Amino acid sequence: MKKITILLLLIVNISLLGYPNQTTYDIVLLDGIIVDGTGKPAKEGALGILDGKMYLLPANTSAESDRIINVSGLVIAPGFVDVHNHTDRSLINPNSNLNEGFIRQGVTTIVGGPDGYLSPVGIQKLKDSLAEHGAGTNVACYIGHNSIRSEVMKNDFKRDATENELNQMRTMVKKGMEMGAVGLSTGLMYTPGSYGNKEEVIALAKEVEPYGGIYDSHVRNPVHDLIGSDREVIEIATSANIGGKIGHLKAVGLQNIGKIRAVIGLVDSARAAGHNIVSDQYPYDGAATTILARIFIIPKEIIQSETLNIEDKVENQFVIILKNLLKDQVIREKIKTVSENGENGGFAWLKATGYTSMRITHSQDFPELVGVYLSQLAEEMNKEPFDAISELLIKANNPVYITLGAIKEQDVQDLMVQSWNMIASDGAYALPGNQGGHPRSTGTFPRVLGHYVRELQILSLEEAIRKMTSMPAKFIGLNTRGQIADGFPADIVVFDPATIIDKSTFVQPNLFSIGVIHVIVNGELVLFEKKITGKKPGKFLKKESFESYKYGE
């Protein structure tokens, strides 16, 4: 490629402005629209990348590089930082560590271990894998309450921890922070964390305070006690004197429609009192998705008598046997009891979210039912809810898909515009062609930029990008990520603001988004002209700062 000569005057200006006094960059992004991640207005400019660092260049730069990429009309933004992401489980496998589904969204850093599921042992495995094999994205992580509680209390977890057990957990939290974790995460809706009381979590949260860590929570009872559960997050964080984040905040279920305004009031009050409370959100009106058969729990004695593999609920064998069992009213009652209450008090989706929170998202046999809540289905059929879903399952020849947590679109929008609310996916590793999963795993960030910024215009481009970049990065202490600034690591996304959009749906959740053109991680192109390069420059990112940040004013 023909090199462009730098004028002597430009060389002088470069040295004065703080970017390298040299003649050749590794990459130059030319004539783009720079949105720097801070919320400041977009401006025309160029970006030079050298030795993994970025440097702002004038819009009419003559900077020299062997790789000059013209990005006229495209947005140059910091790579997106996904603060609630589950792909860490896949990134330790060299066969699944490209993380293409997130690269194609513009994500350059994921924060793994949310919902309480990463122990010091897990963190070490993650660090070792990244050091040896790399990844398509950078990875930071939380230290997880569920994992350490499980390691300390084993199967005897349905009780309060003893002082000795609590001390063991404290030690593990400190170890996780010393390994570079950004804070403590909990999944208080799930076992064994659900058996830990507020005082236990406060004690553990206090251990991250000396490290400048934060508290991130999948709240305890988001459907049946939305306000109380979100208030608990605030109480834990403020008691530990650390920042607190309500993970994937939403108002799920018919009974909670409109209550997001009350939660917004709680957060606003806490912030007005000087507490660093924030939230993250994915831009969809439904939470986790599954097939209807998955919410049924068959009692163990019946499983044993049927020699049924309960671990593989998508197999035809399971559905066929389940349908036959439900035709027997005596057995149906037994299945109802454990499905609605959990076996021996354990977890059950019908107990956690309930019929008023589950909505049908796809049915090949009964398309007219799409959008209907299971509680509404029961009313229409004039049956008890469990009988209604049993009859639907029996009659359907093809899988019926549901969301386990339906959300009203107005509540999604009311939360999205709050200055302290971040964008995050809650997504997992996406495999094209796989029917399972949720569209958030391939569509979260482009959906915000395409649907909520370009189409609905409820957010400005600059504000949306702030919510995806500098705000999450600063909150968790990755202070040189999430912002375009001289000398910062070159994590960059280049996208077309006119075309970026998600393509995945609840029916086809693993379709890749469009509109992201180039992605750079630590100075290396992982996506070039919409094509995956195969490079894996991602690394483990330790918390950089011990300061406490309050964003969103």
Residue ranges and their predicted role:
Residues V71-I76, F80-T87, N93-T186, A205-G212, ...:
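Divalent-metal coordination cores built from histidine and acidic residues
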Residues K175-V233:
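Divalent metal-binding pocket/active-site signature
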